[in-house]
Amino acid sequence: MGYISNNNLINYLPLSTTQPPLLLTHCDINGNDHHQLITASSGEHDIDERKNNIPAAATLRWNPTPEQITTLEELYRSGTRTPTTEQIQQIASKLRKYGRIEGKNVFYWFQNHKARERLKRRRREGGAIIKPHKDVKDSSSGGHRVDQTKLCPSFPHTNRPQPQHELDPASYNKDNNANNEDHGTTEESDQRASEVGKYATWRNLVTWSITQQPEEINIDENVNGEEEETRDNRTLNLFPVREYQEKTGRLIEKTKACNYCYYYEFMPLKN
């Protein structure tokens, strides 16, 4: 009695190259069991059908074609800035022959185009206000010098000749170094002369103050005990007068008496 070896048993068994089918069991309302056999190939087919059922418009953006852009720009240049709902539908229906487009795409294109035009206009106006500095070529140095625009107006009384050291600093420094040696000896003599002049002026002021008589000042004491300083009013004496003072207590009264010897009286003429 012979036995079949394991190797011979494996050779007799058929080999399956496909995946085993899946058996799904579900129960309905009546309680009956239903069996459904699903294979791997049928599952892949169901996935492909689900992908095809997804709408393409929900996943794609609007990519305008050159023909659509050209048509929209022509409409904008012709005067269309904010189209109405009917105009948007008409424009979209005309542009669909060049590619996919919707009404909202037309509306947003006009809005964005107007915003870009406003931004460009503001940049041009801002560039016109702010002007760059002019580069003026300097013939003496051979380079360029930047001249800044004057913001304040010039007045006639402020226009004065510019000093030489401001016009040409190099030449002024050379002349200044040469003149310092010549003026070195004269500075001491000028200083001595100024001191002598100051001393003479001071001596004249002292002499003048001594020779001048101080003005007579009357100090009267009022009822409240306050002191007032009053000075004599200087008047032009047309006729010679004689002055005398009368002292009465603390008060000093000055009176002026007229000299009647020099008094003249003019009488009217008789016809």
Curated annotation (Swiss-Prot):
A GO cellular component entry from the record: primary endosperm nucleus
Q: Do you know which SMART domains this protein is assigned to?
A: HOX (SM00389)
Q: Name one GO biological process term.
A: cell division
**Compositionally skewed regions (Basic and acidic residues) per UniProt:** 132-148, 180-195
InterPro entries in UniProt: HD (IPR001356), Homeodomain-like_sf (IPR009057), WUSCHEL-like (IPR044555)
Key words of the record: Developmental protein, Differentiation, DNA-binding, Homeobox, Nucleus, Oogenesis, Transcription, Transcription regulation
The answer to whether the entry has keyword Cytoplasm is no
Q: Where is this region: Disordered?
A: 118-195
DNA-binding region, as residue ranges, is located at 57-121
Gene3D superfamilies under this entry? Answer: Homeodomain-like
> What is this protein's tissue specificity according to the annotation?
Highly expressed in developing ovules. Present in developing primordia and differentiating organs but absent in mature organs.
GO MF entries? DNA binding; DNA-binding transcription factor activity
| Pfam families associated with the record | Homeodomain (PF00046)
Q: Where in the cell is it found?
A: Nucleus
Keyword flag DNA-binding: yes
Entry's family note: Belongs to the WUS homeobox family.
Alphabetical list of PANTHER family matching this protein: WUSCHEL-RELATED HOMEOBOX 1-RELATED, WUSCHEL-RELATED HOMEOBOX 6
Function of the molecule: Transcription factor that plays a central role in ovule patterning by regulating cell proliferation of the maternal integuments and differentiation of the maegaspore mother cell (MCC). Involved in AGAMOUS (AG) repression in leaves.
Q: What is this protein called?
A: WUSCHEL-related homeobox 6
